[in-house]
Amino acid sequence: IQTGTYKDLMIDIARHSYTTKSFGRFKYLYRIMGIFGRIKDKKRIDIQAVSCLKHDSLAFLEKIYCPTLIIGAEKDDVLGADGSLGLHQHIKGSQLIILPECGHALYEQNKNFQKRVLVFLES
């Protein structure tokens, strides 16, 4: 699956994890990491990638009965906000929050994320 270099992989991960604005701030760091980092086990990365693409746990979501907080990101180009909405629709009684101006790595990009999680855990 992965045919490029480690540097290509790092940049691709960053590009899909962050908003365009945030990626602009981190792109040089990821390029440096890509230059000095190495893929230790290419086969393992391929297995993980295939698992991400083929794994379907939708049937198990209806078996979740504990309080569940789903926090999605408006600009998530990995799962999309629709992915978070889909989880919410299948987990009875779940709470859904979509944070604006965030990408897939919303936990790193939005201070509101930590506040929302803390409020949920304390409730």
Residue ranges: model-predicted function:
Residues 96-114:
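Catalytic histidine-centered segment of alpha/beta-hydrolase-like enzymes
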Residues 56-65:
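The feature captures the conserved acid-bearing segment of alpha/beta-hydrolase catalytic domains
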Residues 116-123:
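C-terminal alpha-helix
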Residues 1-33:
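Helix-rich cap/lid subdomain of alpha/beta-hydrolase
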Residues 77-83:
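Conserved alpha/beta-hydrolase "acid-adjacent" motif
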Residues 65-66, 93:
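Active-site acidic short loop of glycosyltransferases
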Residues 64, 70-72, 76:
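Short beta-strand/loop motif that positions the catalytic acidic residue
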Residues 33-57:
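Hydrophobic, aromatic-rich cap/lid helix
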